[in-house]
Each structure stands twice: as structure tokens, then as C-alpha cells.
């Protein structure tokens, strides 16, 4: 049974489960459930024993100390998308708008064997691990390699379908040999791992130095897809030259601009509303001038403020809540049928997407035709 906590779904929270506690939209905390521990927030403390046994997605509420108010959090099951929002950042990460598009363009499936160069914080590694057959991830920085290895073991990825190796692929290539610093487990007579990759993702400062090393580790019997993740257009330019030199085709560069839009209703303001607003401004201006004149003539006393507005006979007016379409007055509930509304949208203020250029290319190493296999495919389609 797989120990990968990102590969399936569970109904109930159990002892030792990795959970993601949603405090707010910008504050999601990964927490391992242990009955004797407590999750502390600025709103209050949430004992783990009160969370264990509840269904995933539950709202956990507590009474705040010294008041009758309640604080609450939601306990969610980890997914690669939520992990991207909550993980500890060791480097810049690939956010979901980019990662989902890359996997779709490279036709990732349980059949895929993927090379990822540049493990970093492991955001994309978790997305790959959920969807592909096997992931070979490479990280040149030793401390980040050890941190990622420990994290992958804790999440059950190493025991499932992920291999991570400490290697500068720009200098040493992608071959995994016995004696290398890697999580790969070699067989008795095995001296090198067979990668046979059909998907390659390069998140490197200089992908053009790594591309020449790919021919020895990619599949020769099927179409191989490649994506280079580059922040600068100058990197793309250098990468294109090397891709052409080493026989990669169908090259295309894409930039993802993922944005979320908030939908709401806004009241339609008429010309009469605008005219009334101008009259109101003028009326208040004249009242202010009149009040300053009376103050100058010492005709206003200390009780004048309390009396407020009066009519022509000097009788105080009763204040009524009036609707003002320009922001002042009584509050009107959005969608009130007594007023006219229109649908509007507003783009989110903060865009959580690491802006980079995605360079896609494909390569077929063995272009010879296997007539026997072609005939077999044709016969199967005729049926």
C-alpha cells in the first residue's frame, strides 16, 4: 500500500496524518496530527485530539479567551495545489497555473517517466508525483537536496515513485550510477539506473548546458517532450539555439498570465443621482458658510451642535437614513430588488504565479518505421 499522502483521498483525519490547516486564504499551515500536541494561532489554540477523528474539510471552532466570540480553522487533506500555497520556500517555485499547463502540454500520464532538473522547494515535484509513472529529480545544492529528500520521505514520495539525486546536471549529466548521492536503490547486478525518460522539465539558470546530456537518458522509441522554465527572454534565446543544434523540433515559447477575477454586483447610478449629489454638496456648502457667519457674530451657542438641523420655523428635523449612491447614507444590500444592478468583475490584487517563459520542444530519436507494429495498430483500429 502506498504511503504517499498526496496520491489518494481519505474521509477521516487519523493520528500521524499530514494535514493542511486553513487559517485564512494567505495562511495555510502544514501540520502533522499528534494527539498530545496543540496548534496555536493568534485567535486561539486548537488541540490535535479535538481534530483527530473529524472528516477532512471540517470546520474546527473554539471560544476565544475572555469573550463570547468563536475562532475557527478548516482542516484539509493535502493536495499538490494546496501544498504549493503552504510549503516552506527554499527557492522560487512553480505555481499551479504554470505546472498544470506544462503537464498538459507534455501529455503527462501514469505512463510518463519524467526528468526534473532543479528540485528547489519541491512544488512541481509533488504535482509530477501524483500524475506520472516515475519522477527522477535532480538538485545541485547539497543542503536543498537533503531538505527535499527528508520532505519526500516524510510524504511517502520516495517509497512510491520519486527518485532524487544530488547532481549538477549541467556539468555531470543525468546518468545515475552506483555510488552517486541518490535515493535510487540499485539491484544486485545493477550499476546504472535506466531512466528512459519521455518527459523532461528543466528549471535551470542555463538549460542550454544541460540539453546536450539528454540524448543518453531519453527514450528512443517514442516522442519525448521538453519544457524549459526561464525567467529571462535572453535565456530563451540561448536555449533555442541549442535545441535546434541537437535536433529538437516543434519549438514554441509560451508565457502564462493566470489571474483570478472577483464577480460582484454594482448599483447603476443615474443622471438624477448625480444631479442630486451636486445639489447636496451645494446645500452643505451654504450651510457651512451660514454657520461660520453665525459663529463670527457670536450667535451660536454650545447647544447649537446638539440641536442639529431645523426647518424654516426653527423646529429640529428628525434625521432619516437616506440612500446615497455615491457612498454615504444607509447601507443597501447587494442585489436589493428596489434598485438596478449590473454584473462587474475585479481582478485580484496579488497574482500568485511566478512569471517565466515556458519553452516547449519535442524530439523523436528513432525515426525508423516498425511495419509489424504499424500493421498491428491498423488491425486494431479496423475492429
Swiss-Prot record:
Enzyme Commission code: 2.1.1.220
Any one GO CC term of the record: nucleus
Lineage: superkingdom: Eukaryota
Localization (cell): Nucleus
Keywords attached to this entry: Methyltransferase, Nucleus, Phosphoprotein, Repressor, S-adenosyl-L-methionine, Transferase, tRNA processing
Residues bearing PTM Phosphoserine: 302
InterPro entries membership: SAM-dependent_MTases_sf, TRM61_C, tRNA_MeTrfase_Gcd14
Known catalytic reactions: adenosine(58) in tRNA + S-adenosyl-L-methionine = N(1)-methyladenosine(58) in tRNA + S-adenosyl-L-homocysteine + H(+)
Family from the record: Belongs to the class I-like SAM-binding methyltransferase superfamily. TRM61 family.
Self-association and partners: Heterotetramer; composed of two copies of TRM6/GCD10 and two copies of TRM61/GCD14.
Protein name per its UniProtKB record: tRNA (adenine(58)-N(1))-methyltransferase catalytic subunit TRM61
